[in-house]
A protein has these predicted regions:
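Helix-to-loop junction immediately C-terminal to a conserved catalytic motif
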Residues: 15
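ABC-type ATPase nucleotide-binding domains, specifically the catalytic core motifs of the NBD
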Residues: 19, 60-78, 88-90, 185
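Conserved ABC transporter NBD signature motif
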Residues: 23-31, 43, 77-82
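C-terminal boundary and immediately downstream tail of ABC-type ATPase nucleotide-binding domains
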Residues: 51, 87, 169, 175-184, ...
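Conserved ABC ATPase signature
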Residues: 99-103
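ABC ATPase C-loop
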Residues: 116-117
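Walker B catalytic motif
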Residues: 128-129
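H-loop/switch region of ABC-family ATPase nucleotide-binding domains
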Residues: 160-161
């Protein structure tokens, strides 16, 4: 959808950052409509907000591990998970001891995704992950999401207007207009800028 159509509001509502005014949110056969964001996170929902929102004074590794510090029990080894994440994002391992503020926009986006992955969530919400990032990094992130979706059975809910990223994801797309779902289609159907403008009302 174009700007102001309710995409970010929907993502924040799913995550529990905004209260739902009507309807119900169900995850793993459980009604989580009134559950806290922390409960939803513990249940297996990760969130990468628009604008990344990393902690600029913490190191890259501290940013990634921050969610771990808030938990006491794990069904996995946090250190093993960290190494797995570093294998996905080598630049983060290279810069693991530098402050988040020193990273480029594309590196910060990788960091935000890595932070969401550290708890091995089943669903990850990403709000405009390609915003303000150079095309090569957009392609890299698209490959990561596509591979994780195929190989680890994770579900990604992605808000995006970047056509190149959408085309990398073999997924269902929905069009939102003022909070209403008006169309459902495959990402392969949005394969040109012209088509996207027709469907999503995008403009230069």
């Amino acid at each position: 959808g174009s700007n102001g159509m309710g995409k970010t509001t929907l993502m924040k509502t799913i995550m529990g950052l905004i209260d739902a005014r009507e309807g119900k949110i169900t995850f793993k056969n459980e009604d989580i409509t009134n559950s806290s964001p922390d409960y939803r996170s513990k249940s297996g929902i990760g969130y990468v907000p628009q604008g990344r929102e990393i902690f600029s004074t913490l190191t890259v590794e501290q940013n990634i591990m921050l969610p771990i510090y808030t938990r006491k029990k794990f069904s996995f080894s946090p250190q093993d998970k960290l190494e797995e994440i570093y294998s996905l994002f080598p630049i983060l391992k290279e810069k693991r001891y530098v402050d988040g503020s020193s990273l480029s926009g594309g590196q910060q986006q990788q960091l935000a995704i890595a932070r969401a992955l550290i708890f091995d969530p089943e669903i990850i919400i990403l709000d405009e992950p390609a915003e303000g990032i150079q095309p090569s990094i957009v392609k890299f992130i698209g490959n990561i999401l596509s591979n994780l979706s195929k190989n680890s059975k994770k579900t990604f809910i992605v808000v995006e207007q970047n056509i190149s990223l959408i085309s990398q994801l073999n997924s269902d797309c929905i069009l939102l207009e003022k909070g209403i779902l008006t169309k459902k289609l495959k990402s392969s159907e949005i394969n040109t800028v012209e088509k996207a403008r027709d469907l999503l009302s995008l403009h230069n």
